[in-house]
Regions:
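Metal-dependent active-site segment of extracytoplasmic phospho-/sulfohydrolases and closely related
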Residues: 6, 202-246, 252, 329-332, ...
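Short secondary-structure boundary/capping segments
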Residues: 20-24, 135-137, 190-194, 239-246, ...
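A structural signal for short, well-ordered beta-strand segments and their strand-loop junctions
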Residues: 8, 41-42, 117-123, 174-178, ...
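Active-site neighborhoods of enzymes that stabilize oxyanions during catalysis
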Residues: 263-440, 446, 450, 478, ...
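Active-site-proximal N-terminal segment of extracellular/periplasmic enzymes that hydrolyze or transfer
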Residues: 1-37, 47, 465
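Active-site metal-binding loops of divalent metal-dependent hydrolases
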Residues: 10-11, 229-232, 404
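His/Asp/Glu-rich, glycine-adjacent segments
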Residues: 52-194, 199-202, 328-377, 395, ...
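Short, solvent-exposed loop/turn segments at the edges of secondary structure
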Residues: 48-51, 220, 237-241, 246, ...
């Protein structure tokens, strides 16, 4: 029987992970990698906790899942009555976190639904898990609240380790375990700080105990262990409170945690805190976004001028993006504009008056080619993720991307974030992938791990997911020639052999 253990170390930067490995501080992980492999992958956008877990656990991007961000507003139902409409102003950072499962599109299946013999530990995505298979749900709520206020993060990881080792003693085929301490310590102390090093060393000890148990039961060779992260991080030297910025322009603005505002003309939903979605005229229900041409009109926000032009002049803003009346996504920065379109199965980037994504000129490529072509770019894989952001009707009218070193919350960010994430910058989007099985040399997105895990477990891959089968660990282990697994519409039962099409 094959098993899969997906261990997510929240907020772990790949360069920090590699330095600790090279320094000899992670001996158990190092031993695992001698037979396995390690690489870097591009995460989902926005690069923030919970939302960026979706590619791992559904094989779909956040836009496909209909989850545009960790905070969002339902423009179709919000009428400006803050108490009656409070469910239309979503935040997975507080009491609404359990709503995430129901908010995911119904035709998107989690791995917990596809693999019934699953356990989730400290998971914000739990659809498909019974109470018995989500054993840490209460501890996650308690320790998560205490850690946020007290900066006491290690007890959460210790609880995760305890539940993980207990799950390993059972018969679960798939086990997901989220270790939150590295992210918590990164926000307050930095990505390469001593508290992060200590937390990562404790994860290494847990991996050693897990492998020791699997070796003692004769299961280690049939167990796939993946150590991943959902986002990176970068230092924050300046906080631009974006909601307060809109208020300073004379725009009544709704933003968490104060979500009541009389006759609001904007709603600012921050993620990470390096990006934000802005909804224009949120108290007027509608089903469609406003194009950027209308967002520029003074009467849209009631600011007395072109608020988009004023926004991109701010030093903290890398660029903004919105749909255009002429089609596609228009990107605006202080240095010029460009357009992203889809045509004949390719994503096209057309500089107009500038090159806001810093790609050096026009490019047209398939979605798979974009990840390789932009790997070392300032905003890797950005065209793919920008299109995905506007794939869901729940996303804002205007997407605001912060420059590295800046974020968009100040007054209500308690405790202060000295390091952050959530943007499209390389430091936020590139994440480590360590595996007990060899990994491909081709560039990966985190969403591509999903079909590989199902293939290892002998389950068919659902139709219509965004993850591509570029990594087939079971096939490689069995020494077969590289071929693609059959894609089917629903999960069904696991098979002894993965059906292959030639």
């Amino acid at each position: 029987m094959t098993r899969c253990f997906l261990l997510l170390v929240d907020g772990l930067r790949p360069d920090v992970a590699e330095r600790r490995l090279a320094a000899g501080d992670l001996p158990h992980i190092s031993a695992m990698l001698k037979q396995g492999g390690r690489t870097t992958a591009i995460t989902g956008f926005p690069s923030t906790t919970s939302v960026a877990y979706l590619p791992f656990l559904t094989g779909c991007t956040p836009g496909h899942c209909d989850i545009p961000s960790i905070r969002w507003l339902d423009r179709s139902t919000y009428t400006g009555r803050w108490w009656r409409d409070r469910k239309a102003v979503r935040s997975y950072c507080g009491y609404q976190a359990p709503m995430l499962d129901d908010d995911i599109r119904k035709d998107v299946q989690t791995i917990f639904e596809l693999v019934p013999e699953s356990v989730g530990i400290f998971t914000p995505v739990a659809r498909g898990l019974s109470r018995e298979r989500d054993p840490s749900r209460r501890e996650r709520q308690v320790w998560g609240s205490l850690a946020h206020v007290s900066k006491w993060h290690q007890p959460s990881d210790d609880a995760v380790a305890r539940h993980l080792l207990k799950a390993a003693e059972g018969s679960s085929r798939f086990v997901f375990a989220q270790f939150p301490a590295v992210d918590g310590f990164t926000h307050q102390s930095g990505a390469d700080s001593a508290p992060v090093h200590r937390a990562l060393a404790r994860v290494d000890t847990t991996v050693g105990r897990l492998r020791q148990h699997l070796t003692s039961t004769g299961e280690v060779e049939d167990s796939l262990i993946l150590i991943v992260s959902d986002h990176g991080a970068s230092a924050v030297h300046t906080h631009l409170d974006l909601a307060d910025w809109f208020r300073a322009q004379g725009v009544p603005t709704v933003a968490h945690p104060v979500v009541w505002e009389r006759k609001p003309r904007a709603a600012v939903m921050v993620a990470g805190n390096g990006s934000a979605m802005v909804y224009a005229r949120p108290g007027e229900p509608r089903n469609r976004r406003l194009p950027i041409e209308r967002l520029r009109r003074a009467q849209t926000f009631g600011s007395g001028g072109d608020i988009v032009a004023a926004l991109i002049r701010e030093p903290s803003i890398a660029f903004v993006a919105a749909e255009s009346e002429d089609g596609g996504i228009l990107i605006e920065s202080a240095t010029g504009s460009a357009r992203i379109t889809e045509r004949n199965g390719e994503i096209c980037y057309h500089p107009l008056s500038g090159d806001p994504l810093l790609l050096g000129g026009p490019q047209s490529a398939s979605a798979r080619q974009w990840v390789e072509a932009t790997w070392d770019a300032p905003y890797p894989d950005a065209p793919f993720h920008l299109l995905d952001q506007f794939r869901t009707p729940r996303s804002g009218d205007l997407l605001v991307i912060g420059k590295e070193g800046y974020d968009f919350r100040a007054r209500y960010e308690i405790p202060e974030h000295r390091w952050g994430h959530g943007s499209l910058t390389r430091a936020h989007m590139q994440t480590p992938v360590w595996s007990s099985q060899p990994l491909p040399t081709a560039p990966l997105r985190t969403v591509d791990l999903f079909p590989g895990m199902l293939e290892w477990l002998g389950y068919p891959v659902p139709d219509g997911i965004d993850g591509e089968p570029v990594w087939l660990p079971r096939e490689r282990r069995l020494g077969r020639a590289s071929r693609r697994p059959t894609v089917v519409a629903s999960a069904g039962q696991p098979t002894d052999e993965v059906t292959i099409t030639t």
